[in-house]
Amino acid sequence: MLDPSIDSLMNKLDSKYTLVTVSARRAREMQIKKDQQIEHTISHKYVGKALEEIDAGLLSFEREDSE
């Protein structure tokens, strides 16, 4: 079983596409800046660490209104 689960992650964001975009951007940021918001993570990969941050409520996403 994956941790965090897709169900718990979907409660944090509005769609799977948003989840992929936010986690990929955060993973890339962690690779470049070598920083993470959670000290002890289960995952050793950047995308997994980003998903754990989303699950912990440390990352969020707000849509801009397009006019």
From Swiss-Prot:
Taxonomy, superkingdom: Bacteria
GO cellular component, one term: DNA-directed RNA polymerase complex
Signal peptide: none
EC code(s) of this entry: 2.7.7.6
Gene Ontology biological-process annotations: DNA-templated transcription
Keyword Lipoprotein included in the entry's annotation: no
Keywords: DNA-directed RNA polymerase, Nucleotidyltransferase, Transcription, Transferase
Catalytic activity from the UniProt record: RNA(n) + a ribonucleoside 5'-triphosphate = RNA(n+1) + diphosphate
A Pfam family it matches: RNA_pol_Rpb6
Keyword Cell inner membrane part of the UniProt annotation: no
Gene Ontology molecular-function annotations: DNA binding; DNA-directed RNA polymerase activity
Gene3D superfamilies on file: 3.90.940.10
Subunit field text: The RNAP catalytic core consists of 2 alpha, 1 beta, 1 beta' and 1 omega subunit. When a sigma factor is associated with the core the holoenzyme is formed, which can initiate transcription.
Known role: Promotes RNA polymerase assembly. Latches the N- and C-terminal regions of the beta' subunit thereby facilitating its interaction with the beta and alpha subunits.
HAMAP family per the UniProt record, alphabetical: RNApol_bact_RpoZ
Family: Belongs to the RNA polymerase subunit omega family.
Protein name: DNA-directed RNA polymerase subunit omega
Source organism per UniProt: Bacillus velezensis (strain DSM 23117 / BGSC 10A6 / LMG 26770 / FZB42) (Bacillus amyloliquefaciens subsp. plantarum)
Record lineage: Bacteria, Bacillati, Bacillota, Bacilli, Bacillales
